[in-house]
């Protein structure tokens, strides 16, 4: 019920970020992007939208809101002078991520990769470990590979798990080699483990480059 009402409200008020701030907490509020518990199966489209087209339209609404606000907006006073409302880009991207999760649309997931750096790190780690596991395009592969060097340990760990199940190209392994210059010991160990999966000739080339 909450989602249905908030969905209808977003149809009308998506051009008003201050109103979206009050809509968003109820919008798709039954979804949890968590690596733990029983949340990895993913939401069903039919539980939240009438059609795929409607879901994509709402994704575009959310993207418009994202582009119209700063990292965090504060609306105060809000309705009453003692109240305030907040809207962050991370909040918006999380709802966009839910839509890409339920649609299984590779092109939409490609599009979201440009916005994922704004997402709060715990949720970003969950998205990589659940929705981008495995990646379904080269762009998604590159995003996961880039995340192997993220500041967040959670994000790095999930990226490593995804990459461990992939066969990396020589070009991708070159990018993994670059991570060995960073000081984080866990990041370096992950990079070495990935490089050790290469065929013997490519591994020898990696060792030669790293020693020169």
Regions found by a protein language model. Give the residues of each.
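Structural detector for internal amphipathic alpha-helices that build alpha-solenoid repeat scaffolds
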Residues: 1, 11, 29, 44-47, ...
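Non-catalytic protein-protein interaction scaffold segments in large eukaryotic complex-forming proteins
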Residues: 1-66
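Amphipathic alpha-helical scaffolding segments comprising HEAT/armadillo-like alpha-solenoid repeats
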Residues: 6-10, 56-63, 71-81, 105-116, ...
């Amino acid at each position: 019920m909450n989602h249905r009402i908030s969905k209808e409200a977003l149809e009308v008020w998506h051009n008003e970020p201050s109103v979206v701030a009050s809509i968003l907490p109820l919008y798709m509020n039954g979804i949890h992007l968590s690596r733990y518990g029983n949340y990895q199966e993913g939401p069903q489209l039919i539980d939240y939208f009438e059609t795929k087209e409607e879901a994509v339209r709402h994704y575009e609404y959310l993207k418009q809101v994202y582009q119209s606000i700063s990292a965090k907006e504060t609306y105060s006073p809000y309705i009453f002078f003692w109240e305030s409302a907040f809207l962050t880009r991370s909040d918006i991207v999380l709802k966009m991520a839910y839509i890409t999760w339920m649609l299984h649309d590779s092109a939409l997931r490609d599009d979201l990769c440009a916005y994922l750096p704004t997402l709060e790190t715990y949720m970003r780690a969950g998205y990589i470990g659940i929705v981008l596991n495995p990646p379904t395009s080269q762009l998604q592969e590159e995003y996961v590979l880039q995340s192997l060097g993220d500041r967040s340990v959670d994000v790095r760990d999930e990226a490593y798990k995804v990459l461990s199940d992939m066969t990396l190209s020589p070009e991708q392994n070159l990018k993994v080699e670059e991570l060995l210059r960073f000081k984080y010991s866990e990041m370096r160990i992950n990079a070495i483990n990935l490089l050790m999966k290469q065929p013997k000739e490519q591994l020898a080339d990696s060792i030669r480059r790293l020693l020169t």
